[in-house]
C-alpha cells in the first residue's frame, strides 16, 4: 500500500477517536445540527477504521510467520501462515481502497429522469414509453416511488418527451449511468413489410437538488409563462391557465409542467426540474474533465454518446461502454436492470481505483 494512503488511514483513525470523544461529552446534544453531523461522520469513519485495524493485524500475523521460518520444525507451518496472511492483506488492501474512493454526494438523492424521442418518429416515441415503463418497473423492484412531472404524448402512444421523478434512497447511485443514447432495433407495429427499423431515445438522469438554495436562481434570469394544459388532466385542468413554462434566459433552458392540479404546483415542480438541470449541467462539465483524464467511457456525462442497444429480433441488450451483452431483453424491459447497473458501478469503481494507483 502506498505511504500516502497509509498516512490518510492513520489520520482517519485519529479523527474517529476525536469524534467519539466529542460525542461522549455531556453538552454534545446541545447543538443538534452539529450532533447529527458528528454522528454521520462517526458512521462513515467506523467501517474504514475497522478494516484498517484488520489490515494491520494481518501485517502483524505476516511478520510473526516470517520469524518462524528460521525454525526448521515450524517451516512448513510458517509457509502456510505466510501465504494466508498475504492473501488476507491483499483482500483488505482492495477493500480499503474501495472505502477510500471519493463519495458522490448525490448518490442518495432522488432523481429526475428525462426521456426524449430522437430519430425514428412515432417508433422512437413508443420506445420512449417502453423505457419509462422499464425504469418504473425497476423503481418498483427497489420500492421507490415514480411521479410523472411532465409528458408530451405522441399520437400513436408513447412520448415525444417525458420527465419523471423517482423518489427513493440510492436512486441516483443506481441509475446515474443511464444517461446517454439508447437505440432500439425492432419491427414497428406500423411496418407491413416486416422490416427492422432503428430508432433512438436520449435519457438524462439528474439528481434532485435538496433545496432551491443549492443553486442560485436570480428572478431576473427567469421568464414565466402560463398556458392551458392539454392531455390527461380532465375538464378542470383545461379551463384554467394552470400549465407553467419557465425559461432560464442565460442558458435558454425551458421547463414545462402541466400535470399538477394548480398553477402553483406546476410552478414549484418546474423550478425543481430547472434547478436539477442547472446543477446537472455543472456536474457534467466536471465529470467530462475527470473522465477525459481517466480515458473513461462511464460517467462522462456525454448525452450524445450511444450507450446501449436493445435488439428485439435477437432478444439482446448490449451496453457498449463495458461490452456487456445479455440475452434476456424481455426481463430487462420489465425492469430487471440489476445485472447491468451492478456491472456499470463495478467498472466505474475499477476506473477510480486505477486512477488512485497512478
UniProtKB/Swiss-Prot annotation:
The keyword Cytoplasm applies. SMART domains: PCRF. Pfam families: PCRF, RF-1. The keyword Hydrolase does not apply. Peptide chain release factor 1 directs the termination of translation in response to the peptide chain termination codons UAG and UAA. NCBIfam families: prfA, PRK00591.1. Belongs to the prokaryotic/mitochondrial release factor family. This is Peptide chain release factor 1. It comes from Neisseria gonorrhoeae (strain ATCC 700825 / FA 1090).
